């Protein structure tokens, strides 16, 4: 039964994280019910913006770190430093990627964006995640938005100070996507 669940879920556009296969208890999981905004809107829904921002920060950090690791010479501080043209290209590539592995799941009855770089604490023994739809396009647009808002230079400087600093730049602050009072830029018609 568990094997058939693992084989069936990818066909439905979702995947599961199984618990221990030696467990005798049965596991059940349901896909999160997405509303029309989550299914069809071209923007990231407000309640998922913090997760999206954190995913973007992680991907930028990951791409820049990999590019720096390819450099041989170290600067006087023992760090590898990318040239402006290289980090500009790397950041553009991080936004242009396919954004595979991201989707929406439900943790404690709360919908969350999930994927690489996004930790939601203790994970249930089985989970269904919806990965199809507009999520890759939305994440790419969000990434390019932050690239335009902060600029490559400021993003690379934050990256050099660490992943937390980069995430704080993009997502923190009083108007950041992860602030308590993040602005809702949409207006009702």
UniProtKB/Swiss-Prot annotation:
Keyword line: Disulfide bond, Endoplasmic reticulum, Secreted, Signal
Signal sequence range: 1-16
Disulfide bonds: 50-178, 53-171, 95-143
Coiled-coil residue windows: none
Principal cellular location given in the protein's record: endoplasmic reticulum
Entries under InterPro entries matching the protein: DUF3456 (IPR021852), MZB1 (IPR052682)
Motif (Prevents secretion from ER): 186-189
Pfam families: DUF3456 (PF11938)
GO biological process, one term: regulation of cell population proliferation
Keyword Mitochondrion applies: no
PTM note: Forms an interchain disulfide bond with IgM monomers.
Any one GO CC term of the record: endoplasmic reticulum chaperone complex
Protein's cellular compartments: Endoplasmic reticulum lumen; Secreted
Protein purpose: Associates with immunoglobulin M (IgM) heavy and light chains and promotes IgM assembly and secretion. May exert its effect by acting as a molecular chaperone or as an oxidoreductase as it displays a low level of oxidoreductase activity. Helps to diversify peripheral B-cell functions by regulating Ca(2+) stores, antibody secretion, and integrin activation.
Family affiliation: Belongs to the MZB1 family.
Subunit structure: Part of the ER chaperone complex, a multi-protein complex in the endoplasmic reticulum containing a large number of molecular chaperones which associates with unassembled incompletely folded immunoglobulin heavy chains. Interacts with HSP90B1 and PDIA3 in a calcium-dependent manner.
Annotated protein name in UniProt: Marginal zone B- and B1-cell-specific protein
Natural source organism: Bos taurus (Bovine)
Upper lineage: Eukaryota, Metazoa, Chordata, Craniata, Vertebrata
